[in-house]
């Protein structure tokens, strides 16, 4: 089991998850079913009473279709190290000429 990198900020994590759930117009039940966790456990995570495992958090992020660039924020709030590289367009890609349609 991965160790926590820092003290979890359960309030921030819950607020972030609630934001993504509302943005996606999903109920707690829908998200919990898609993530493979009980609705009660998801509710406890969202209100800050429980800290999910890294795997559970990734499953919830998948269920909510959280963009990869925003998943690191969720991981950090839960006390885990980020796992997604923050890569942008590099100069070579920006200078590439794309074929016209």
Regions found by a protein language model. Name each.
Residues 1-24:
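A short, Lys/Arg-rich alpha-helix, primarily the initiator
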Residues 30, 41, 51, 70-73:
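Residues in the helix-turn-helix
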Residues 22, 33, 62:
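Alpha-helical residues within the helix-turn-helix
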Residues 35-52, 59-61:
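Recognition helix of helix-turn-helix/homeodomain-like DNA-binding domains
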Residues 2-3, 55-58, 62-101:
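Short amphipathic recognition helices of helix-turn-helix/homeodomain-type DNA-binding modules
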Residues 15, 25-26, 52-55:
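Residue-level signal for the short linker/turn that defines the boundary of a DNA-recognition helix
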């Amino acid at each position: 089991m991965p160790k926590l990198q820092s003290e979890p900020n359960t309030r921030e994590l819950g607020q972030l998850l609630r934001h993504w759930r509302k943005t996606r117009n999903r109920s707690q039940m829908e998200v919990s079913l898609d993530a493979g966790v009980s609705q009660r456990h998801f509710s406890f995570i969202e209100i800050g009473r429980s800290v999910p495992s890294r795997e559970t958090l990734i499953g919830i992020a998948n269920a909510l279709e959280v963009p990869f660039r925003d998943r690191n924020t969720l991981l950090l709030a839960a006390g885990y190290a980020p796992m997604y590289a923050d890569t942008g367009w590099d100069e070579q890609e920006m200078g590439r000429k794309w074929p016209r349609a």
